[in-house]
C-alpha cells in the first residue's frame, strides 16, 4: 500500500511540484493545504503517514501547525520545507518535532531521500 502524504504550502506551484515528485515515485497524496490551520484540519481528517510542511504561510505558520499536529498525534512524521535556510528556524522545527528539513529550491532526490528516511 502506498504511503499517504499531506502537502502543506501556501504556493500552489510548490504543492504541484512536490505532488509531482511524490506521485511519480509511488506515493499517494491524500490532501493539500495552503496554510497551517488547514494543515491541522486535513491532518485530523486524513491521518497521513507523512506531512511536508512549509514554514512561512498566512493564517498559521508551519512551526505552529507542526506543534498543533504533534499535540494531536505525538507520532506524526513531518518534514519542513522552506526557502529560509535560517539556522534558528531549523532548530525551532526540529525541537518542535520535525523529522527533517528540506531547503527550497530542492532537488527531487533530496525530497525522496528525506521522505524515505523518515518513513523507514
Swiss-Prot record:
Location in the cell: Cytoplasm
Cofactor notes: Binds 1 Mg(2+) ion per subunit.
GO cellular component, one term: cytoplasm
GO biological process, one term: phosphorelay signal transduction system
Binding locations of Mg(2+): 9-10, 54, 56
Superkingdom field: Bacteria
All copies of domain Response regulatory, residue ranges: 4-119
Post-translational modification: Phosphorylated by CheA. Dephosphorylated (inactivated) by FliY and CheC.
Disulphide bonds in the chain: none
InterPro entries (UniProt xref): CheY-like_superfamily (IPR011006), Sig_transdc_resp-reg_receiver (IPR001789), ST_Response_Regulator (IPR052048)
Keywords, alphabetical: Chemotaxis, Cytoplasm, Magnesium, Metal-binding, Phosphoprotein, Two-component regulatory system
Major location (coarse): cytoplasm
4-aspartylphosphate: residues carrying this PTM: 54
GO molecular function: metal ion binding
Cofactor: Mg(2+)
Effect of residue 54 to S/T: No chemotaxis, tumbly swimming behavior and shows exclusively clockwise rotation
Additional observations: The signaling mechanism of chemotaxis in B.subtilis appears to be inverted in comparison to E.coli.
Function: Involved in the transmission of sensory signals from the chemoreceptors to the flagellar motors. Phosphorylated CheY interacts with the flagella switch components FliM and FliY, which causes counterclockwise rotation of the flagella, resulting in smooth swimming.
Quaternary assembly: Phosphorylated CheY binds to FliM and FliY.
PANTHER family, sorted: TWO-COMPONENT RESPONSE REGULATOR, TWO-COMPONENT RESPONSE REGULATOR ARR22
Descriptive protein name: Chemotaxis protein CheY
Organism, as annotated: Bacillus subtilis (strain 168)
Amino acid at each position: 500500500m502506498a504511503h499517504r502524504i499531506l502537502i502543506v504550502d501556501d504556493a500552489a506551484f510548490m504543492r504541484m511540484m512536490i505532488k509531482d515528485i511524490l506521485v511519480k515515485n509511488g506515493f499517494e497524496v491524500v490532501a493539500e493545504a495552503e496554510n497551517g490551520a488547514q494543515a491541522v484540519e486535513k491532518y485530523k481528517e486524513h491521518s497521513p503517514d507523512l506531512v511536508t510542511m512549509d514554514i512561512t504561510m498566512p493564517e498559521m505558520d508551519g512551526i505552529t501547525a507542526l506543534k498543533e499536529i504533534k499535540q494531536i498525534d505525538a507520532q506524526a512524521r513531518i518534514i519542513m520545507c522552506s526557502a529560509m535556510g535560517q539556522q534558528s528556524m531549523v532548530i525551532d522545527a526540529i525541537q518542535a518535532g520535525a523529522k527533517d528539513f528540506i531547503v527550497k529550491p530542492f532537488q527531487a532526490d533530496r525530497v525522496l531521500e528525506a521522505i524515505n528516511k523518515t518513513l523507514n
